């Protein structure tokens, strides 16, 4: 594991250089980061009781560096409701800060990204619709000859990778539907993740975050063309991330105060954030956007990905062989390396998917949609309809073999029905 930790650290340093500080007890660099953009900032940080010690530490650092806090704002609710984004955008417009400093998890940082876009590029109209999809923010910024405010992100939860990635979600609560902005221009200019901050995270939050990070790496690994120039880098980032989570998460769930395991999971999910800059997520992430009112995002992705593994299997056979090695301890011992090597793609996909489910069971994680309270068949219809939305088309294109909206009913519905019951016998494959 030490070698994997060193590899993860090197990959992250090669990616972000001096713009990202990570490790244990590394918050002090915040003052220098914020000072690069001016002598004042808008501070976003939770006012909940759990954050009191962290808030004091952040305030002390900013005061020591003579940085004026123009306003202090509470963090977004989970899943970044659009109302929270608009509220924050209005505060940004009224305070005119030199920078935005956001201390929080993925939802809080996503909210800061979204609000920055609104306040900077649409100050007279609180409408995010023009920015949804891929590359829309940069295009509009260039057309209007405007720039976003500098954003410094201080991550507090392992999982989303929002502090080092180009993605930002927002939820339309009335429709119970999540949407996505994906553009490298919204990536925070500076980021910090002191993994010791995660020591107090409860077990469910810890697991869901880790599985979210794993899903980023897994889906991007699946969707990246093995003949592409970047493939070797993608493979290294994704497989390092996945293997660290598969090895360390069961240990961490039994020892939540173990700083070594916390660091491993932090590094691994950070690699998932790095992966988001190298490629895009696909099926499970797409469907998770329609399940926000009954389960967390990470939980939805974790349940769905084994079934997409089977669906994608005929297009990713060589990738599955490497995943079989990572999940080896969760594979039936009767399957020797020689026997695994001789399996056809579909059988290999089922074997790896069953190993993923065995891993989930090891950490007391649900393995099918029917186990989730509140789930019913209407959610399958909702996921199918959302998959046809042009704003989410990139998720279909990111599949190992891209789907079009007109093929969603034929190919995606059987996968979702399988995920409902835990049955891998569906006939359709992606090719």
Regions found by a protein language model. Name each.
Residues 331-431:
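C-terminal charged capping/lid subdomain of soluble metabolic enzymes
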Residues 167-279:
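Carboxylate- and glycine-rich phosphate/diphosphate-binding segment that chelates Mg2+/Mn2+
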Residues 27, 51-55, 82, 107-112, ...:
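Short glycine/serine/threonine-rich phosphate/pyrophosphate-binding segments
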Residues 227-237, 252-264, 278-284, 338, ...:
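Flexible, glycine/charged-enriched surface loops at secondary-structure junctions
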Residues 279-353, 357:
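C-terminal catalytic subdomain
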């Amino acid at each position: 594991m030490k070698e994997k930790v060193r590899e993860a650290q090197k990959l992250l340093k090669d990616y972000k250089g001096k713009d990202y500080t990570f490790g244990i007890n590394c918050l002090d660099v915040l003052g220098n980061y914020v000072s690069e953009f001016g002598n004042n900032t808008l501070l976003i940080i939770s006012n909940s009781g759990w954050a009191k010690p962290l808030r004091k530490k952040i305030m002390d650092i900013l005061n020591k560096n003579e940085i004026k806090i123009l306003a202090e704002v509470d963090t977004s609710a989970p899943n970044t409701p659009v109302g929270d984004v608009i509220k924050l955008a209005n505060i940004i417009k009224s305070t005119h800060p030199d920078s935005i400093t956001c201390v929080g998890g993925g939802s809080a940082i996503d909210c800061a990204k979204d609000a920055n876009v609104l306040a900077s590029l649409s100050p007279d109209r609180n409408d995010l619709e023009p920015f949804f999809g891929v590359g829309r923010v940069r295009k509009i910024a260039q057309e209007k000859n405007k720039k976003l405010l500098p954003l410094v992100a201080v991550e507090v939860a392992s999982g989303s990778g929002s502090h080092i990635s180009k993605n930002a979600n927002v939820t339309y609560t009335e429709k119970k539907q999540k949407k996505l902005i994906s553009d490298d221009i919204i990536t925070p200019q500076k980021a910090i993740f002191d993994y010791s901050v995660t020591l107090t995270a409860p077990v469910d939050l810890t697991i869901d975050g880790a599985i979210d990070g794993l899903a980023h790496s897994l889906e991007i690994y699946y969707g990246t063309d093995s003949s592409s120039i970047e493939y070797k880098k993608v493979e290294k980032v994704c497989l390092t991330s996945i293997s660290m989570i598969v090895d360390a998460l069961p240990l961490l769930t039994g020892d939540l105060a173990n700083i070594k395991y916390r660091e491993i999971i932090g590094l691994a999910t950070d690699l998932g954030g790095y992966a988001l800059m190298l490629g895009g997520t696909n099926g499970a992430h797409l469907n998770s956007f329609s399940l926000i009112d009954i389960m967390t995002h990470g939980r939805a992705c974790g349940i769905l990905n084994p079934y997409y593994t089977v669906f994608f299997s005929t297009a990713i056979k060589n990738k599955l062989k490497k995943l079989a090695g990572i999940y080896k301890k969760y594979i039936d011992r009767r399957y020797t390396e020689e026997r695994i090597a001789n399996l056809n793609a579909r059988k290999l996909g089922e074997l790896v998917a069953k190993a993923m489910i065995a891993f989930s069971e090891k950490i007391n994680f649900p393995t099918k949609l029917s186990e989730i309270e509140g789930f019913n068949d209407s959610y399958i219809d909702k996921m199918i309809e959302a998959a046809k939305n042009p704003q989410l088309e990139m998720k279909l294109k990111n599949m190992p073999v891209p789907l079009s909206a007109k093929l969603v009913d034929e190919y995606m519905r059987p996968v979702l029905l399988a995920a409902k019951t835990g049955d891998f016998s569906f006939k359709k494959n992606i090719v």
